[in-house]
Amino acid sequence: MTTIIAFIFVFGLIVFFHELGHFLFAKRAGIMVKDFSIGFGPKIFAYRKKETQYTIRLLPIGGYVRMAGEDGEEIELKPGYRVGLELTPEETVSKIIVNGKDQYVNAQPIEVSLCDLEKELFIEGYEDYDDTKKVRYQVERNALVIDGKIETMITPYDRSFNAKSLGNRAMTIFAGPLFNFILAILIFTALAFVQGGVPSTDNTLGNIMPDGAAAQAGLEKGDEVLSINGKETKSWTDIVQSVSENPGKTLDFKIDRDGKTQDIDVKPATQKENGKEVGKIGVETPMDTSFTAKITNGFTQTWNWIVQIFTILGNMFTGGFSLDMLNGPVGIYTSTQQVVQYGFMTVLNWTAVLSINLGIVNLLPLPALDGGRLMFFLYELVRGKPIDPKKEGIIHFAGFALLMVLMILVTWNDIQRAFF
């Protein structure tokens, strides 16, 4: 049960931040957002506020933000349609009832002759279905079209995705992966504050373990190690290397303590790691507890992981591709099961790493991914006009189908690794 809760928390948080990026930048650009959904499948929770419906769905392995104009959805009332109109006191249309007119007793019956619900926002027709009573009404920008129990808000063209500038469209799509990186930065920064600091690379000693060789020799926390056996030490890595390479051998530590230099002999204990003997003196990594270090930790950790993940991706394509290099939901669940054993802080760290992974994967220039859409925007920038929407739709559909096939293969491979 703990693993299931952790899995839902991790995926839910990552997906929420990704979709939040799309949502906020769409709103900033003036794009109508019709749906903000976390998860796929049947609805667990639904709430509508103004023009947007917010939903949580059963499967927490994805989400979406549905923006006006993205899916080609448009409301068309052809000449001859008989509808009911609810009017405001100013005689503008607030509701267009297509089906279920009997439930709106005050609706004005009209037979449509001409209608524009995108640009000029008007409806013309014959009142009471009488061709001698021609009328024309302006339609409210937030008017609803009611078809039985389904209510759909009209989309003025200037509120649609495609009506916006190339820069606004590109930023709205890029904002999803961007917010995945922001989530990682926030988590790594929070962890630095909770843990009281970040590991330092300085050549100073951290906490001294009571029964270790360092404590027995008289070393203290905060001692600056100038050299070991005459070899200058400039960083914590230099100290670790010198100690590890000399198990059971007495080492001359030249240290600076409170401005005074002194020599202390330390004999590292011998321990086995991966079948090899190494030296240990019982000293923890020094911590940088400064405010600046805690704040910058989020950025440096995120950047280091980005570089590392891109390096792995490069090796995948240059060194030969294998399904074992990829993890689907089952593989991530299995990894989460292991991570949970080390506590909540480790789960948070795992969430940050996964969020960076999702951000990078979504930026890959593949159809159906955010990166694929950004490539089409680049094409539009170079060519001066967008690709034909039908062609783009076909390419995205083909890309989505290939991704689904790959996901099925990866998931099957995950199941075999986990259970067979």
Curated annotation (Swiss-Prot):
What are the catalytic residues?
E19
A GO term (biological process) for this protein?
proteolysis
Q: Which PANTHER family match?
A: MEMBRANE METALLOPROTEASE ARASP2, CHLOROPLASTIC-RELATED, REGULATOR OF SIGMA-E PROTEASE RSEP
Instruction: Report the source organism.
Output: Listeria innocua serovar 6a (strain ATCC BAA-680 / CLIP 11262)
Return the EC number. 3.4.24.-
Upper lineage ranks?
Answer: Bacteria, Bacillati, Bacillota, Bacilli, Bacillales
Q: Which named protein is this?
A: Putative zinc metalloprotease Lin1355
Superkingdom as given in the UniProt entry: Bacteria
- Residue stretches making up the PDZ domain: 176-260
Known InterPro entries for this protein? PDZ, PDZ_sf, Pept_M50_Zn, Peptidase_M50
Regarding protein family, the annotation reads:
Belongs to the peptidase M50B family.
Q: Which SMART domains match?
A: PDZ
Name the residues that bind Zn(2+): H18, H22
Q: What keywords appear on the UniProt entry?
A: Cell membrane, Hydrolase, Membrane, Metal-binding, Metalloprotease, Protease, Transmembrane, Transmembrane helix, Zinc
A GO molecular-function annotation: metalloendopeptidase activity
Q: Which residues cross the membrane?
A: 172-194, 304-326, 347-369, 393-412
Cofactor(s) listed: Zn(2+)
**PROSITE patterns, alphabetized:** PDZ, ZINC_PROTEASE
Q: How does it sit in the membrane?
A: Multi-pass membrane protein
The cross-references to Pfam families, in alphabetical order and at most eight, read: PDZ_2, Peptidase_M50
Tell me the NCBIfam families matching this sequence.
Answer: RIP metalloprotease RseP
Q: What class of enzyme is it?
A: hydrolase
Offer a single GO CC term for the protein: plasma membrane
